[in-house]
């Protein structure tokens, strides 16, 4: 019998860490994550059992319920009883749509296990692979729930034997992901198996599930499942095999408790001294160790203000406690410690290591921050996002008086969602909002309107990047007063280092020795590493190549400022630069400090960088999306025709049941009218999704037109600037 546990009872159970599990639900969009999660909530008494599968209680944002997809990650604390043992299970339901994959990545840092939900008919899809890879990179152990088994019975009308064969094929394909992405020591140990009940089958919509353990205990066979549907006895099947028993039983059996998981996860996500007292406390998940927590999500609550949600890896967090927000180099006071029961926040006073607290009062905290009772400790490794903001819109208030309110709302949105980027265009004064895709931006604009700010938005536009494919000799630029000379050259930066900068693995916020070691691992010599002047998170570097020159040290900030300005907006189209390695080779400064301040050296540095880029020759990069289309087999040719007309290409085609899955690539700039054309060519029978795959050079056939279009919409002169506008002669 389901019994709802009070907060006091839950707190009593979690004193024993063996009784805690932290897991997330991850999946391809529309494979049934949130519907499954509802059944688990009903089992714990948080929603009515009759509403499970319909309430979408984990989609407690109005936008989520209207769209029928999960946009935010929602976390909840569940109670589960297995025979005589009681467990507290912290569950996070994550978005499935690729535009919100950043939220999935941050959630994975907080959990130790993942239930991967997969449609029995569609099988392993692109986003299934992506989220599973993310989980394995975070050393989060996956188990598999094959959902929508009712489709095999009602749509495909499979026999028990054929049904088992189909399910076994899904399991095999899933294990291939582990062969590809799991670290060697876990590759075999973490493979899922029907025989050990790390695979569960069921229907989240109909609220039943079975695995080997349930089948043995209840005497259920696949024939019984088919008979339940053919004889209209699904309710009896639900009574014998409720979904929550099978799924939560699988979680308890195969996912580790926090003190076990942290022994192998901490060395991966925290690069401090593991032999220190701090390191030992993290590895052991000690309640009496220093308080150390990583924030994975910020929620703005109308009543409580900022709520910082994260994983407490060490120590105990209490109401009224002062913590150091390490990344921000500030202190904050925890007003109250809470956990979530659905969309209800429960104040608990304190929580120990291994839990997922929700802290009120830390307004200066952001997702990714490390909180600690000890100042100056090593921060947790940053999370690596699989995509970048590639689509943008311009936003302005319909009524000018609402501008301050719009600025405030946008600030709140970027606190909640670090993948949303807001900037002011200095030329036009427009507010530009960039996101992972059109849906991401659509949701953001709805949030602004929900805040009672009427806005006008532009059509969505693609973000581009600029880079260099070759190097150049040093060029010279003078300051506005003509009294200072800066010499600069550029060459391509190793892509691996660019990726490490963008992921935050290499950062000026990190320990200098650790940064030096990482750069040496990439082949840089000791002297070059010592001379790093500036690390740009967009994926660019500046090296100090000067020798025996006066005033370089005191001029560094000004020169770095000019470098930063050049990296924000490259010379070709004023798009961000990436993968560029600059060397500041020589400096001829004015002797009087009054003549070599920021107003002089900043512009000179920017001009020198721009001159070097144009001398080397810049390339324009566009985002390329991977696309996956599910379509009736006789319409595969129509899909290929659409992709070809959009400068895309088909990479592969496989048949799955009555349909075929076409995978390919397409430039992001060609996707704005793709829905209409795909519907027209396939009579509305195609279902497709796409996600960012890589940056690629714009083909010469489209380059001139692309440059012209970008410069025109930015209000720039038709032609890019020339080298002579940035470099000076002796």
From Swiss-Prot:
Keywords: Cytoplasm, Elongation factor, GTP-binding, Nucleotide-binding, Protein biosynthesis. Residues 711-730 are annotated as: Disordered. GO terms for cellular component: cytosol; ribonucleoprotein complex. It comes from the Archaea. Transmembrane segments: none annotated. Disulfide bonds: none annotated. It holds the Pfam family EFG_C. The keyword Protein biosynthesis applies. The keyword Disulfide bond does not apply. Residues 18-238 form the tr-type G domain. SMART domains: EFG_C, EFG_IV. It is found in: Cytoplasm. One of its GO terms (molecular function) is translation elongation factor activity. GTP binds at residues 27-34, 93-97, 147-150. Belongs to the TRAFAC class translation factor GTPase superfamily. Classic translation factor GTPase family. EF-G/EF-2 subfamily. HAMAP family: EF_G_EF_2_A. This is Elongation factor 2. The lineage of its organism: Archaea, Nitrososphaerota, Candidatus Cenarchaeales, Candidatus Cenarchaeaceae, Candidatus Cenarchaeum. The gene is fusA.
């Amino acid at each position: 019998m389901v019994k709802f546990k009070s907060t006091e009872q839950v707190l009593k159970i979690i004193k024993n860490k063996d009784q805690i599990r932290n897991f997330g639900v991850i999946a391809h969009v529309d494979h049934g994550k949130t519907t499954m999660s509802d059944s688990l909530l009903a089992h714990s008494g948080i929603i009515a059992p009759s509403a499970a599968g319909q309430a979408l209680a984990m989609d407690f944002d109005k936008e989520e319920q209207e769209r029928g997809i999960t946009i935010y990650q929602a976390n909840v604390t569940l109670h589960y009883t297995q025979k005589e043992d009681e467990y507290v299970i912290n569950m996070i339901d994550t978005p499935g749509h690729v535009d919100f994959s950043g939220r999935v990545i941050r959630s994975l840092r907080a959990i130790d296990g993942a239930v991967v939900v997969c449609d029995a008919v569609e099988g392993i899809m692109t986003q299934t692979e992506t989220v599973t890879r993310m989980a394995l990179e975070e050393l989060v152990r996956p188990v598999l729930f094959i959902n929508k088994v009712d489709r095999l019975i009602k749509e495909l009308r499979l026999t028990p034997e054929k049904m088992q064969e189909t399910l076994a094929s899904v399991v095999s394909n899933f294990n291939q992901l582990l062969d590809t992405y799991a670290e060697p020591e876990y590759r075999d140990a973490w493979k899922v198996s029907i025989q050990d009940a790390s695979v569960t089958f069921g229907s989240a919509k109909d609220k039943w599930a079975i695995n080997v353990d349930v089948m043995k205990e209840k005497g259920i066979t696949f024939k019984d499942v088919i008979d339940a549907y053919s004889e209209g006895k699904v309710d009896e099947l639900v009574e014998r095999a409720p979904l929550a028993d099978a799924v939560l039983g699988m979680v308890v059996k195969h996912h580790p408790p926090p003190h076990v998981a942290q022994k192998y996860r901490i060395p991966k996500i925290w690069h401090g001294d593991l032999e220190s007292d701090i390191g030992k406390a993290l590895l052991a998940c000690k309640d009496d160790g220093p308080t150390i927590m990583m924030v994975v999500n910020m929620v703005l609550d109308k009543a409580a203000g900022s709520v910082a949600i994260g994983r407490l890896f060490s120590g105990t967090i209490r109401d009224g406690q002062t913590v150091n927000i390490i990344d921000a180099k500030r202190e904050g006071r925890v007003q109250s410690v809470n956990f979530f029961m659905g969309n209800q926040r429960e104040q608990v006073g304190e929580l120990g290591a291994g839990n997922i607290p929700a802290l009120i009062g830390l307004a200066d905290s952001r997702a990714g921050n490390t909180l600690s009772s000890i100042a100056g400790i090593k921060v947790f490794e940053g999370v690596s996002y699989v995509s970048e903001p590639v689509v943008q819109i311009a936003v302005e208030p319909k009524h000018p008086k609402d501008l301050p309110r719009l600025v405030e709302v946008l600030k709140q949105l970027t606190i909640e969602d670090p993948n949303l980027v807001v900037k002011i265009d200095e030329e036009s004064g427009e507010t530009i909002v960039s996101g992972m895709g059109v849906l991401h931006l659509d949701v953001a604009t709805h949030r602004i309107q929900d805040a009672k700010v009427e806005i006008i938005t532009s059509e969505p536009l693609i973000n581009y990047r600029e880079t260099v494919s070759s190097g150049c000799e040093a060029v010279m630029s003078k300051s506005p007063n003509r009294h200072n000379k800066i010499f600069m050259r550029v060459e391509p930066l190793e892509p691996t280092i660019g990726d490490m900068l963008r992921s935050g693995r290499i950062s000026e916020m990190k320990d200098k020795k650790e940064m030096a070691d990482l750069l040496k691992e990439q082949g840089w010599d000791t002297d070059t590493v010592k001379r790093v002047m500036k690390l740009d998170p967009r994926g660019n570097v500046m090296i100090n190549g000067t020798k025996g020159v006066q005033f370089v040290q005191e001029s560094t900030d000004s020169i770095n400022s000019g470098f930063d300005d050049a990296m924000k907006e490259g010379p070709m189209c004023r798009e961000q630069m990436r993968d560029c390695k600059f060397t500041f080779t020589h400096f001829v400064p004015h002797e009087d400090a009054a003549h070599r301040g920021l107003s002089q050296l900043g512009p000179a540095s920017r001009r020198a960088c721009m001159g070097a880029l144009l001398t080397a020759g810049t390339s324009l990069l566009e985002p390329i999306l991977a696309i996956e289309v599910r379509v009736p087999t006789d319409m595969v040719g129509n899909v290929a025709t659409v992709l070809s007309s959009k400068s895309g290409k088909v990479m592969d085609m496989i048949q799955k049941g009555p349909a075929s899955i076409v995978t390919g690539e397409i430039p992001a700039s060609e996707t704005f009218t793709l829905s209409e054309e795909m519907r027209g060519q396939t009579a509305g029978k195609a279902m497709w999704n796409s996600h960012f795959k890589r940056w690629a050079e714009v083909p010469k056939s489209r380059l001139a037109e692309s440059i012209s279009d970008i410069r025109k919409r930015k209000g720039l002169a038709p032609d890019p600037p020339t080298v002579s506008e940035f470099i000076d002669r002796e």
